[in-house]
Amino acid sequence: MSPARTTLGVLLLVLAPAAALAADWADTLERVAPSVVAIQVDAARAFDTEWNVSTQATGFVVDAERGLILTNRHVVTPGPVTARAIFQNREEVVLQAVYRDPVHDFGFYRYDPASLRFAAPRALRLHPAGARVGTDIRVLGNDAGEQLSILAGTLARIDREAPDYGPGKYNDFNTFYLQAASSTSGGSSGSPVIDVTGKVVGLNAGGSTGAASSFYLPLARVARALALLQSGQAVTRGTLQVVFRYTPYDQLRRLGLTAETERRHRKLFPARTGMLVVAEVQPGSEAAGQLEVGDILTALDGSPVAEFDALAAQLDDSVGSRVSVEVERGGLARRVDLRVVDLETLSPASLLELGDTVLHDLSWQMARHLNLPVRGVYVANPGFLLTQAGVPRGAVIEELEGRPVAALGDLVEALAAVPQDQLVQVRYVRPEEPLNPRVSAVRMDRRWFPARTCRRDDAAGRWPCRDLPEPPVAEPGQAGQAASTRFDANGDPVLDALAPSLVQVRFDMPYSVLGITERNYRGTGVVVDAGRGLVLVDRNTVPTSLGVARLTFASTLELPARVAWIHPLHNLALLTYDPQALGDTPVRSVRLGEAGLRPADEAWAVGFKGDGRLVGQLTRVASLDPVDFPVSRTLAFREANLETLRLVNGPTDFDGVLADASGAVQAIWATFAYQDGRRTAQVGQGIAVEDVRSLIEAYDRDGIVQSLEVEWQPVSLAAARRMGLDDAWTRRISEHSPTRRSLLMAERVVAGSPAVGVVEPGDLLLAIDGRVVNTFREAEAATVAGLRQLLVWRAGAEVTLSVEPVGWSGSDLDRVLVWSGATLHDPHRAMSAQRGIEASGVFVAYFMFGSPASRFRLLAGRRITEVDGRPVTDLDDFMAEVADRPDGSSLRLKLVDWNGTPELITLTLDEHHWPAYLLERGTDGWARRRP
């Protein structure tokens, strides 16, 4: 044979098996793929190690007759969940969670096979013994959200330690993991790891962010659980509350393993190169004090043990029984008898929702991270109620009002006796300091959110809930009561003069509305009328009427307050409180100055710091300048048409007042919130006393503020002349205001207002009703109800315009609808003022993660303008369109974003986890009801 023919023959011999293998893989993948599904997961509540979230993953059919789908535990989730599976032919089925392992990263969903009309998936066979080093594998899954991706690899390890995802997160233990370099990523969780025959040899569970390594769960315990579910039996899981770690022999010898024990185990388990060693003993367990870290496990009930599957097999079949545990410690053999605990009793299966807070029993998963006994109530989500008290996520509640809280039932029973607005003392530990308990005062508040308990029902695949009974009525003197106090002398005459007129203000929002992203605020309030209990604040302290306001007097007495008035145009608001509740506390109205402040004037900045101390700082006025903040990305309130005082090295750590040496207030030292790109910031500036007086006058008059609905910006006379302003008007403006040679130029017109199509950007304002105006204050003073005549300079000539002002009340928000996890209300002025958006439709202010709004992208900042093709102009229209829709039904929503781009989405209702309710503001405050 010639050399060429020889080479070709060798090449064919090499390529032929490769081609055959490729063909085998192609056939296998074609056969397996129809049984792999993409799973859309909506974890409706934060629970245990998981947050509420909308995400995606993978699963695969393991029993086509029963509709069982295998995936990861963290995909089934330990808490309330809704999920759907999408087959490769794009058929969609509803899933019900039927099992999640207490420790290992696997679980099962169930679907109704009869609901499939076109797909005919076959069950994939689990083959635990097929996981061997060197096995070529393929991972089929929804990798990176691509519905179906196929990733190749070769099993490199079958005895890898379980991956560690960090403290406070879900972590598997007491099992080996498989490892290969297949570069799986988000969305591929729950993917089948198959061999060339199509058998499943592992379950994809996680991967390394810094390498191509992927980690797969072995299937021995999975196969057992599946068999029990198929036979209708409970999946028993036992534990000693001990975490073992597989340790090689070289390290075991240093721990004191005897030569005889090593010889015996090497002979019994020739494939193993190590044994199991105690790595953690859970405090409070029976094993605590009997087993120690470093103990080498040699036998269980007399049977030698060297790996996790054998250990689990014995424990899972011995729940409730006692077993003999044999270990070696420092070369000495020891034996202890321990009861096998049911793992399900260490996994929470019920929750309490109260004030947006989610609470449940502490799990072994989280107790491990804290090194605490599995006892107490875990804060899965601090929500509105506990955030106000400073209790964080991950905290464990141990006592309530001095009563021990061992389990959720204890807490539910204790809270049932707490009236609305009453304070209770909660003792808890934080995850970063589990050995250092803390105590916080929590104020009971059930007006904003549903209050209910929910318990998992695996047979139904749901979490049925029961509303808590109404709280008892507070007895006189229990809630919201105050006594009298006095104001101590500070030793500073200015602070002493102002102390009786300044209060600490705390404001907490239960929902994000009006484009406001932060929910908890602290600041300084000014008592402007002690007889009526009237307190002035800035809108960066009280940004809306939807929330809870409380005032603290003399750092001693705390009173509830009500939002009385929100200035519709400027950064000011008014609160009211009951003066009678202060007894004879010598609170007095602040003394407002007459002269105001000018550049170079000295002033005392006085206010409360974050720690409650009243402080003062002598400063000087640097300038009086117009505000010029960027438009809000979230469509929140933004100050405009106002000149503010800027200080030389003004305070940045408190707000309050600017006063003269006698204690007369000449300005409010306010903080202004603004958004610069994606960054939210705030800056301190002074609001002149003249503007404060006009606010109080408007409130006392009828509470209505008239607005031309035009945003003005000062321009110099030189700039105006470049725009064609003639000499006559230049002289007239100079004579009208010799020290302020400028005009107001129209920059924006509020969409939907009478000024649209009349006033145009670039118009120079000359006069209103014949009176020359060139400042914001003059323009506002001239804007009264009724048709106004504006004289403007446009395109080189005078133009007379007729504009009807718009009257705005101080009620910024009266209704909020919580629907499908979205917070909805009528469009607000900031949208129209900043972005030129017509105030029609329904504004999406916020959406909750894990909700239908999150899943179907009903995103914040959009407006809903149609429901199923029918127009909606306001919240009433929307509520009428969605009323009486059955749970699980779908509807079409037309959305419009901030720049007018339309979008059509579909949304499926989930009334069980996300019931609709309406928040309404009445004479007695806000109340919640079904719409």
Task: Specify the residue positions occupied by each region the protein language model found.
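C-terminal recognition in membrane/secretory proteostasis and scaffolding
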Residues: 27, 65, 73, 96-97, ...
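Short glycine/Trp-rich loop-beta-loop segment that forms part of the substrate-binding cleft
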Residues: 68, 91, 125-156, 552, ...
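Boundary at the C-terminal end of the N-terminal hydrophobic targeting segment
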Residues: 20-23
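A short, Trp-centered hydrophobic/proline-enriched beta-strand micro-motif
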Residues: 31-45, 139, 497-512, 603-605
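Short glycine/acidic-enriched loop and turn motifs that connect beta-strands
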Residues: 44-45, 76-77, 144-146, 542-543, ...
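Short consensus segments that form the blades of beta-propeller domains
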Residues: 48-51, 146, 314, 514-517
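Active-site region of chymotrypsin-like
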Residues: 35, 41, 52, 112-124, ...
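Bacterial N-terminal signal peptides
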Residues: 7-18
